[in-house]
């Protein structure tokens, strides 16, 4: 079976206009992940695994590595009930993994009910 290529400088929708393919390539998330308080993955793109590092801590393994560790990483979570999250942090980044943690108002690590991450940058 032969492998083919699709080459285009722009994408055009019949009613929504056009967009340059550079915007699609450079402006799209290369990784996204949503997981629950039990660290069960609810949905993902380009994630091979999620390691539970203990309460409020997680390490995400990337399926197709990033080109370098200079990518942009967004992380947010929501805690159940009246627990307020006062700190969410990105602990470390590497081409094949990144780690996060979250704390409540008292500074104790806490598992968010819904945890979301997205990564923007270049794939290797």
Put a short name on every predicted segment.
Residues 77-124:
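Extracellular jelly-roll beta-sandwich "head" domains, especially the C-terminal globular C1q domain
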Residues 1, 15, 70, 94-97:
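Generic low-complexity, intrinsically disordered sequence content enriched
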Residues 2-65, 105-124:
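Extracellular receptor-binding modules and their adjoining Ser/Thr/Gly/Asp/Asn-rich linkers
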């Amino acid at each position: 079976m032969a492998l083919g290529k699709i080459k285009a400088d722009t994408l055009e929708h019949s009613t929504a206009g056009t967009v340059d393919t550079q915007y699609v390539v450079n402006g799209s998330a290369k990784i996204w992940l949503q997981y629950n308080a039990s660290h069960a993955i609810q949905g993902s793109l380009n994630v091979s695994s999620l390691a539970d590092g203990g309460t409020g801590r997680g390490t995400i393994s990337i399926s197709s590595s990033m080109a370098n560790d200079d990518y942009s990483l967004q992380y947010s979570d929501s805690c159940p009930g009246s627990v307020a999250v006062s700190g969410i942090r990105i602990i470390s980044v590497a081409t094949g993994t990144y780690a996060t943690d979250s704390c409540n108002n008292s500074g104790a690590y806490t598992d968010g009910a819904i945890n979301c991450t997205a990564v923007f940058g270049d794939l290797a």
